[in-house]
Each structure stands twice: as structure tokens, then as C-alpha cells.
A protein has these predicted regions:
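A short helix/loop element that forms part of the nucleotide-sugar donor recognition site in Leloir-type
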Residues: 187-199, 340, 377, 381-384
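Short hydrophobic beta-strand element within catalytic cores of glycosyltransferases
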Residues: 298-301
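Conserved acidic donor-binding segment of nucleotide-sugar-dependent glycosyltransferases
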Residues: 313-324, 333-338
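A short, active-site helix/loop in glycosyltransferases that binds the activated sugar's phosphate group
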Residues: 144-173, 181-185
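A conserved nucleotide-sugar
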Residues: 33, 199-203, 218-258, 336-339
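A conserved mid-protein helix/loop that constitutes part of the nucleotide-sugar donor-binding site
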Residues: 17-22, 203, 207, 212-227
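A short, well-ordered alpha-helix in the C-terminal region of glycosyltransferases
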Residues: 333, 340-354, 363-366
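Aromatic "clamp/platform" in nucleotide-sugar-dependent glycosyltransferases that forms part
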Residues: 262, 281
Length: 396
């Protein structure tokens, strides 16, 4: 099978990029050829004998919106010239003007725009808010076209599939393939808090994510911390430009909130804390949640989560991501009852064992093969029909 992946990144260290990396790696391992049309591609894929990397952005471009437009144009131009070289073209959401056979849906921009927690509504007049609204509206408009033109859509969760269906997409076009996790990298083990300058004696929660904007919702965690005075929180995310250190000061919890910046040692960090808290206002299927579960951590998330339906006994889900009181009650429970914390962590790990990357990649490749087989059958039926017509005319 000759596969083209159209996406911004195929990268072991990136969220969606990691999904693309695992698909490409599994396809190459099965003997297929993979061409990546992207801004960045892992050398392991690009330098593989059956791998190829087409760079669709070679010049510096100032804003994400302009970068996306440039990428969409350049990738579409290349695909139009080379489309006949591929059996399957898969795109990640809207990334190219050229229609794809399969579109993977990691995020539904129009759903985020409609979300009551979308922070950039028309009541905000700042240039940054206007820009965020604009880029979300444009993405929402073109992703609808990308979804409708594809033969198949792969949603990363049932939650996401439901959002896509609101576009009027047939259920027959939709397949759910969950993201995965590396259970060898993320696993329970001895704590190494000293590596991060953290005390061994304190109950410790973990938050990982972008802390420059409000979507990941660190603010509610900080407010909840006021009601759980014995709990400390470690925050892993780029601190530069973030308002949250100042907010922690205002809420008088800064002495218990440890901003360690962005780190590549997430697996070690997860083995060093007691539970994971992530009340995001909108998520389709974040990898960090599965990584926490694979590490044997109880997880606490909001109901605005594509992954909330598989947490089960491995954590707690609360409805309103802005409800600091409800979150504080859950965190207090996890601090006070270590045995409950332990049993939830075991359940979380067991659930993660059923969601490994090998299963995710196999799910994508199965969709590719099913679509190809359906096309072969349609082509075969078409040839048979023409033969039947010819035979009928001969008999006459």
C-alpha cells in the first residue's frame, strides 16, 4: 500500500505528531511505503528505505494563520501533481486544500467555538482575542469541507465523533480509533522527586499542559488548592508569558505551587506524584491523560473531555470545569485516602494497557485497508456490469 500522510508534524515528541509517527512506523513495519507531506518529519521515518519526506514549509512565516494557509496551498499543489502515486491519502483535520481519502479528527474547531467556555467571544475586543476567534472560525469553515469530501473520518474519541456528526456526516463514514500510549516509557515506579527539587514528604498533584491560555484550565485547579491546604501542585508547562504564577500569588497558594517549566522528563515526573489533575475546558483525546494512567496515577478530569468515557475506576470526572469546589472535594479525597488512591491508580494502569500504540496504529491501517478493499470491489462490480452489458448486446 502506498500511503501519503498530510500533517504539520510527524514527531515522536509532539501530540498529534506522535499519532502520525506511530501510524507511519507501523505502516513501514508492515512493508507499506509512506510519504509524509509536513513541516517536520522524524528522521526515522524520513530516512527509511520506504519513507519519503516532502517539506511543505521552507520559509519563515510570522503567524500561525499565515503558516497554515501557506501549508494548505503548498501541500495541495504537490498532491495534485502526485496524487496518482498513492493508494491512500490521509490528512489531519483541515491542513490542505486538496481533498483527502481519510481525515483524522483530533479537534473540532466549530465545536470549540460553540463551547460556553470558549474564551475569545465577541465581548472581548483585544487583538489577541480577535485573532484567536478568526483562526478558529477559519479552521471550522474549512474542516467542514475536509470532513465532507473525505471517504472516511477517523475520530479520536466517541465524544469527537459526536461533534463531527453534528455536521450532518453519515455514521457510516465515521470510525473511532483512540489514541495510544507507550506502556514501557510510562509505568509505575519509584519516585524521583529530588530530580525536580520536590520534597518527598508532601502530597503532590500534577498538571501538564499549555499555561499561556485558559483552555487547559489551570485557574480552577489553583482556586481549588485554596481549600486543600496540605496539597502541593507541580505544574509542567512553559512559564514565559503565562499569567498563572501571578494568579497563584493572588490566590495565596504560590508557596505550594511549583512551576517547573516545560520538561522532557514527563515519565519520571509522573512516577513522582500522587495523582494527575487536568480539568480542561475542551479536549478530544489528550495523550498526557493516557500517559498519566499508564504511570499508575489516578486522574481527575472535567466532563468536557473526549477521554472521560474510559476513565472508569481509574479516576474521577466532574461536570463543570469551572467548579472549583467540586474539584477541591475530589482532591481532598485523594489526599486523605492513600489506599483509595492506590486502587484507582491500579485501575488506571489496567485501562491504559488496553490502549497501546500498536492497537492505535493497527486501527488506522485497518481503515486504510478496508477502504482500499471497498474500492476494489466497486471497481470489480463496475467491470462485471460492463461485461454483462456487452454479452447481452452480443446475444441480441
Amino acid at each position: 500500500m502506498r500511503i501519503a500522510l498530510v500533517t504539520h508534524k510527524v514527531d515522536f515528541q509532539d501530540g498529534q505528531g506522535r499519532v502520525n509517527y506511530e501510524i507511519a512506523k507501523a505502516a513501514l513495519d508492515r512493508g507499506h511505503s509512506v510519504t509524509v507531506i509536513a513541516e517536520y518529519c522524524s528522521s526515522e521515518i524520513a530516512n527509511h528505505p520506504r519513507g519519503r519526506f516532502i517539506c511543505a514549509r521552507e520559509i519563515p512565516i510570522p503567524t500561525q494563520l499565515l503558516r497554515n494557509i501557506y501549508f494548505a496551498e503548498k501541500s495541495a499543489r504537490w498532491l495534485r501533481q502526485h496524487r496518482d502515486e498513492f493508494d491512500i491519502i490521509q490528512a489531519n483535520g483541515f491542513v490542505t486544500w486538496e481533498p483527502a481519502d481519510i481525515v483524522a479528527v483530533h479537534f473540532v474547531h466549530s465545536a470549540w467555538l460553540r463551547n460556553p467556555f470558549f474564551p475569545f467571544h465577541w465581548s472581548s475586543f483585544s487583538p489577541y482575542a480577535y485573532y484567536q476567534r478568526l483562526i478558529t472560525i477559519i479552521n471550522g469553515h474549512y474542516e467542514k469541507k475536509a470532513f465532507r469530501s473525505a471517504d472516511k473520518l477517523i475520530a479520536v474519541s466517541r465524544f469527537t465523533a459526536g461533534e463531527v456528526a453534528e455536521y450532518g456526516i453519515s455514521q457510516e463514514k465515521l470510525v473511532v480509533v483512540h489514541n495510544g500510549v507507550d506502556i514501557e516509557e510510562f509505568h509505575p515506579g519509584p519516585a524521583v522527586r529530588s530530580e525536580f527539587g520536590l520534597s518527598e514528604e508532601i502530597p503532590l498533584a500534577l498538571f501538564v499542559g499549555d499555561i499561556k491560555t485558559t483552555r487547559k484550565n489551570l485557574e480552577t485547579v489553583l482556586k481549588a488548592m485554596q481549600s486543600v491546604p496540605e496539597l502541593h501542585l507541580v505544574v509542567a508547562g512553559k512559564v514565559e508569558g503565562s499569567p498563572y504564577p501571578a494568579i497563584a500569588e493572588e490566590l495565596k497558594v504560590s508557596d505550594r505551587v511549583h512551576f517547573i517549566g516545560k520538561t522532557s522528563k514527563i515519565a519520571s515526573l509522573m512516577r513522582s506524584v500522587d495523582f494527575f489533575v487536568f480539568p480542561s475546558r475542551y479536549e478530544a483525546h489528550p495523550l498526557v491523560l493516557l500517559e498519566a494512567m499508564a504511570s499508575g496515577l489516578p486522574v481527575v478530569v472535567s466532563g468536557n473531555f473526549g477521554a472521560a468515557d474510559y476513565i472508569h475506576a481509574g479516576g474521577r470526572v466532574f461536570d463543570d470545569p469551572n467548579d472549583a469546589s467540586a474539584l477541591a472535594t475530589i482532591m481532598e479525597e485523594l489526599v486523605r485516602f492513600p489506599e483509595k488512591r492506590k486502587s484507582m491508580g491500579v485501575a488506571a494502569r489496567e485501562q491504559a494497557l488496553n490502549m497501546q500504540w500498536s492497537q492505535t496504529a493497527a486501527g488506522y491501517l485497518d481503515v486504510y485497508e478496508e477502504l482500499l478493499e471497498k474500492r476494489r470491489q466497486s471497481a470489480s462490480a463496475g467491470h462485471l456490469s460492463m461485461d454483462d452489458v456487452a454479452n447481452s448486446q452480443e446475444k441480441k
